[in-house]
Amino acid sequence: RHLGVNWEKSTLRGGLPRIATTLQKGGVTCNVTLSLQSTNQDTLKAIKRSNLPINDFYAFKSSLHDQHLHTYTELILGLPLETYDSFAAGINQVMSPRLEGSYCIYLCQMLENTELNTEISRKAYQIETRLCKSTVTNRRYQESESQMREIEEFVVATSTMSLEEWKRAYLMGYFSIAMYNHRIAFFVMNYLRSEHGKNPIEFIEFLIDCVLENSVLFPRLYLGLSQIIQQRSLVLDGTSAMRVTDDSGGL
């Protein structure tokens, strides 16, 4: 059994481990959410957010892993003052060598009644967005177009991340999730970092270049990249932020 749990944030360092352990002992597996959103200090200041000091975050996550509690860390693509390099650095930081760890990437949304969704913020951070039919929170993705009535607004460029950089970050980010979370290159990336001092994203960027330049040599990886590129196009075209793509044996 797997239970999706929405954790109350104030329990993070207090009751959360005890609750997760109790569920685990009862035979219910659940992932513990660790939300960072960003590791870039300028970005955190802009969105008025404070995270645990990164060393405390590592220690807390490690303590959960020591109890065989699985975690996933949340990052957001498209936040103000985030750059391609700072976003990549954040992914490097959340990639744990432990099998209990994983992470996910959300696209920055312009939500009603938030400070980011004001003319002042839009102008200050030069925010460029796309309007997409709402599919992110739906559990069924086969609804007809007429059934998708809600529209969501996603950030695709800011003053510090151009549209081309956002596209690059999208491809790098979601490809890295496939390579890391599904353990396709998990051990390779950990070996390169441990033995040769190479950050995981260096390997991911190298792999993307190799696959795109030599698609015949890497057909499965190329198909996986193509699906990510297709999904990215759906966002940029304003079609959908999440849609099932054709599965022809890719990632």
What does each model-identified segment do?
Residues 1-73, 77-79:
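Conserved SAM/AdoMet-binding glycine-rich loop
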Residues 3-7, 89-94, 105:
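Phosphate/diphosphate-binding loops
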Residues 57, 71, 94, 131-133:
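Structured mid-domain segments that build the active-site/substrate or prosthetic-cofactor binding neighborhood
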Residues 36-37, 41-48, 77-85, 97-163, ...:
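Flexible glycine/acidic-rich beta-alpha junction loops that bind and position SAM and/or redox cofactors
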Residues 53-56, 86, 165:
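An acidic site on a long C-lobe helix of protein kinase domains
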Residues 68, 98-101, 176-180:
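A generic secondary-structure signal for well-formed alpha-helical elements
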Residues 153-251:
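Radical SAM enzyme core and accessory elements
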Residues 19-24, 84-99, 167, 171-173:
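Short, electropositive alpha-helical surface patch
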